[in-house]
Amino acid sequence: MKKKYKTKFPMARIKKIMQKDEEVGKIASATPILISQCLELFMADLVMKTCKITQAKKGKVISVNHLKECIKQESTFDFLTEIVDRIPDDKNEKRGRPKKTEGEDGGEEEEEEEEEMDMGEEEEEEEDEDDDDSDEEEEEAPKKGGKGSRGGKGSRGGRGGARGGASTRKVKSETSPVLKNTTITTTTATTTPTPTPTPNFANSPKDIQSTSLKKPSARKSNTTSPKSSPFLSSSAGSIQSPPLNNNNNNNNNNNNNNNNNGNFNNNNNFNNNNNNFNNNNNFNNNNFNNNNNNNNFNNNSNNNNNNFNNNNFNNNNYNSNEDENNNNNNNNNNKNNNNNNNSNNSNNNNRGQQFLSSSTASTITLPSNQYQPLAPISLPVLNNSNNNNSSNNNNNNNNNNNNNNNNNNEHILGNLNNNNSNRKINTNFDEEDSNHNINKSNINSIMNSSNNSIDNKDNGFNSFTFSNNNSNFNDNNNYNPNNPNNNNDNNGNGIVLPSLSSTNSSSTLPSFSSVPPILNTNNSNSNNSISHILNNLNSKKPNVEDEDFD
């Protein structure tokens, strides 16, 4: 309302006049605005009628006489007759403000109206104005005194607040600007010695607060976190550097120090006794430990999942695990010395051997974060000709499982491990194709019942020859990384590893497609048929007496 209807009449004055009557209570804020608008309309009507009288008399300035005549002529202005009679004529004494000869007519008319209103109630208005001014100053005084801008100490209405309020009241009550300046200077002069008063309990908490506010910097220095040092922690984490040397992990099936990056270690030798061949795959005459598929190639151990056992043969117990784990286990009970393969699986004739414990040839994937010298390796499993093999002890691959507790004279096509005898197998692999598939393999099982051993010269388990970079894996304790093209003889001079400069994310290792010629799945030649191999084995039958097996 105030912004929309701007008036020149003071709202406080109108409100004060309205509240002179005792019956009038509170007044709404819109009421003085409406009254000011009524006053404007009334003044405009009065001026227009007075202007007509002035024009009739051929005058240019509206005078008091013109107003008197207008009020006397118009019946609507009868309530103003008493006021007009008190106003003297222009020729007589002039009371009130002097007239302005210059300016617009509207400005002169407003001045005349104000004179007209003030003349009738001069005495009462002067008293009312004094009262209004004092009230307004009292309302503004506590606001300014509370801030303590002129009173001194205490922004919350303390000791200096009352002084400041009193000083501001004195300043406003006095009208001369010179006195205002003097009072300001006197108050400031009186408040200057107040900052160091006598010790009081009221002032002590403020002093304590002032001292306590000086210590946030020390607290911030304590709470700030220390700078992260690259030596203390690393966002990328610790770098896993594989151990380059794994010296003689004796008969360890778990191999916590395996080279997980696919590196063949210098001291991880392919021995007949204790040394582990690491890449998460222990390829020993003692342990062939595949940690990914739990397929163990063991000559001495019967306690691994999915054992790749060349007839685990002990002094007291012969554990063949026949017909316990999988419907597709081969119950090869051989009572003859010819090592006949009596298979109960109809899929064993042409499909050959399934590798590892899966429906197809499983692969062992190596970590691809740092080094990729080696790739997935496919390992042979003897006499397991069906698929859908899981890693939960489903494949117990035993060749020629004999059910005899007296094991001294049994002839098994595989690794015989009697704790009191030395039995070895010669497995010669010839490489022909670039796919690392060994298509020709001969196992000459010449067995002697007197010493329970196989001739080591012709049938020694000497070497696995990979076609990857002409590297040979031998059973001796030497490793020559500087001679990748070393072709070893039957005795073997060391393990020559594939080059580590492979940049492929998944390089491939050669896969053993077959260990005995019976199990070759990649070659459909009639030379590799079961009957042909059995005939060859019959022709090379050792001179051992037949025994009856229970």
From Swiss-Prot:
The keyword ATP-binding does not apply. Residues 182-193, 225-238, 245-350, 382-422 have a biased composition (Low complexity). The keyword Flavoprotein does not apply. It comes from Dictyostelium discoideum. Involved in transcriptional regulation. Component of the NC2 complex which represses RNA polymerase II transcription through binding to tbp and thereby inhibiting the assembly of the preinitiation complex. One of its GO terms (biological process) is transcription by RNA polymerase II. CDD domains: HFD_DRAP1. Its main location: nucleus. It is found in: Nucleus. Residues 104-140 have a biased composition (Acidic residues). Residues 89-355, 378-444, 461-512 are annotated as: Disordered. GO terms for cellular component: negative cofactor 2 complex; nucleus. Pfam families: CBFD_NFYB_HMF (PF00808). SUPFAM superfamilies: Histone-fold (SSF47113). Residues 200-224 have a biased composition (Polar residues). This is Dr1-associated corepressor homolog. Gene3D superfamilies: Histone, subunit A. Belongs to the NC2 alpha/DRAP1 family. Residues 148-164 have a biased composition (Gly residues). InterPro entries: CBFA_NFYB_domain, Histone-fold, Transcr_DNA_Rep_Reg. One of its GO terms (molecular function) is RNA polymerase II general transcription initiation factor activity. Residues 89-103 have a biased composition (Basic and acidic residues). Residues 7-71 form the Histone-fold domain. It comes from the Eukaryota. Coiled coil: none annotated.
